[in-house]
C-alpha cells in the first residue's frame, strides 16, 4: 500500500524508497523530490520567498546531503523537510537584510525572467499577488501556520514540531488565521 499525499499515491513502499534514497539512488531521490517539492515550493511562495523554485531546490540539496541520518516514516520525513524549508527561509531573510538587490529597468530582479508565456506569467503573478494580499491581513505567526497547514498540508503535530510551538497554540493560530482570512475576503469581496 502506498502513502497518499493530497490524493496522490506515493510511488512504491516508503521504507524501500527511503533505503534507496539513503544509498544515493537517483530514482529514489527523484521520487521523494517529486512527492514533496510542490508543497515545499508552495509554502515558500506563500511566505514571500524571492525565488521559490530555486529555494525549493536548495531545500532538497540540504535534505539529500544528510538523508542517510534520517530515520522515520513518511510523515516524519515531511516534518523534517519542512523544518529545513523553514530554516532556509529564515536564513534567506537574514541574508536579504544584509544585501542590496539589483533590479532591471522593467522592475524584474535578476533570475526572475519571464518563462516565455506572457499570459501564464501574468496569471501566476496575479494569483500570487492576491494570495499575498490576503495573507498580509494575518500576523506573521498566523501566516506561517496557515502556510504550513494549508499550503504544505501538514498536520497540527507536524507544524508544532517545525515551529517549536505547542499543539494548542498551533490550533489557535490556525483558527484565528482562517477567521481573519474569512473577514478579509468578506470585506474585500472575491475578484472576478
Indicate residue ranges for each PLM-predicted region:
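Amphipathic, Lys/Arg- and hydrophobic-enriched alpha-helical face
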Residues: 33-50, 66, 135, 180, ...
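Helix-turn-helix DNA-binding module
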Residues: 133-136, 140-144, 152-169
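Short, charged helix-capping/linker segments at alpha-helix termini
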Residues: 3-7, 22-30, 41-58, 167, ...
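A short, charge-rich alpha-helical start-of-domain segment used by transcription regulators
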Residues: 12, 18-42, 133
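C-terminal edge and immediately downstream basic/flexible tail or linker adjoining helix-turn-helix-like DNA-binding
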Residues: 2-4, 8, 161-162, 178-192
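Internal acidic/polar
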Residues: 7-14, 91, 99-124, 128
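Structural recognition of an alpha-helix C-terminal capping motif at a helix-to-coil junction
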Residues: 54-61, 75-87
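Arg/Lys-rich amphipathic alpha helix in sigma70-family domain 2
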Residues: 46, 65-72, 83-104, 124
